[in-house]
Amino acid sequence: MSFSSLLPPPEHSPPDDVNSREVEIITKEHDFIVNALTKKEAVHSSNNNIGSFVGSQVANFNDVIPLRQKDFYGVQAPLPTTQEIELCKVRTQEVVNRLLHKFTDKGKAGYQKDTRKITTGSRIITIESKRQDPLQPSRQKNTSSKIVLPEDDETDTPILHATDDAKSKRLTKEERAKWNIPAAVSSWKNPMGYTVGLKHRAAHGKKTGNVGSINNKVSDIVAALDETDQEIREGIQQENELKRKQLKEEERIKEEKLRAIAERSKIQTQSSAVKKRGSRFEGGRHQNKKIKKEEPPIKSAAERLKELAYAQGREVSEKVILGAAKATTTGTGANVHYDSRLFSKGANAAAKRSEEQVYDNPLFVQQEIDSIYRVNAKSIDEANSVSASRYGPIQFTKAHSLDDKSTAKDEEET
């Protein structure tokens, strides 16, 4: 017996005799298991299962024992058979298919023949409804929440009178003139934006019949308004003139103050300049005296050479400094050639620029480094021209020593 077998059948499933019998058998088995778990006597009783623990009025000691500690005499819940499992599977499959069939049903496909003129021949078009996802939300808007007001039937119906009817009374010209409103005086309509004075505004007494008459009080009011307007304008002009005069006076006072300040500053600068000149002369004299005292005495050339040699870490004799020392001659007084690089190395031996500097000069000059891999067109042209100017066989000459050269020179001189 499975858990799905205990569930009730689907709501919309048709009644079946086989299903009802199976349900009865399952319920009986369920009652038997419940009685066996709750009461010992139910195991030895017949399959009718008359009487239950709920209906009994007398309580036993076994009723107090917990279910986990009771001995059920080997009673086991029967497992469902393969036939029951298959029946449950078929029923659930039918219900699921019936629910999904509403959404996934294609509907009957419609066929329509194309009647257009086609050279290749006629064709048939199939029309099918698109499949919808059953889990997709509905696209229709919920219009039930909208409030629709009922139509108002009680509208104001206009009352129309027939003009041809004899009962209808027509208005005369006098009545129309009473209801007429002049365009200049109308407060409802003034599209051109005209302004009307009080004199002309008071002359619209068509209702009273006094068309051309103007009240004297109106003219008095107009005159009073004009007078007050003129007085106000004159007062404003006078106030503006007073303000202008005050501003001019303030500007004049400011200019005078600035001029006085400028004159004072000029006088102060002139007096300070005169004082500074005198102090400068006196200060310059004292400063020159201090400089002369602080300056070291003038040293001779010999003393300076001694100091220079001492700074370079060399010992130079006084004869060398004074130029009295003479170069020693070797042998018979022949000309001895010295390499000038020895002197430069000796002079720069103690004057190293840094501890990392091992050699006096770099390996290559910077210009030679830059032109290592650069082709020099001038040198190539010179080499070509020299090679082209050569002609004849190569002649070798015998090398001469220094002694041979000196004897040859002596012979030429003699």
UniProtKB/Swiss-Prot annotation:
Q: Which InterPro entries match?
A: SKI-int_prot_SKIP, SKI-int_prot_SKIP_SNW-dom
For biological process, the GO terms are:
generation of catalytic spliceosome for second transesterification step
Cellular component GO terms, alphabetical: post-mRNA release spliceosomal complex; Prp19 complex; U2-type catalytic step 1 spliceosome; U2-type catalytic step 2 spliceosome
Q: Composition bias, kind Polar residues: at what positions?
A: 135-146
Q: Where in the cell is it found?
A: Nucleus
Listed Pfam families: SKIP_SNW
In terms of domain of life, where is this protein from?
Eukaryota
What keywords tag this UniProt record? mRNA processing, mRNA splicing, Nucleus, Spliceosome
Question: Could you tell me which residues belong to the region Disordered?
Answer: 128-159, 264-292
The record's PANTHER family line, in alphabetical order, gives: NUCLEAR PROTEIN SKIP-RELATED
Provide the function of this protein: Involved in pre-mRNA splicing.
Please state which protein family the record places this protein in: Belongs to the SNW family.
Subunit notes for this chain?
Answer: Associated with the spliceosome.
> What name goes with this protein?
Pre-mRNA-processing protein 45
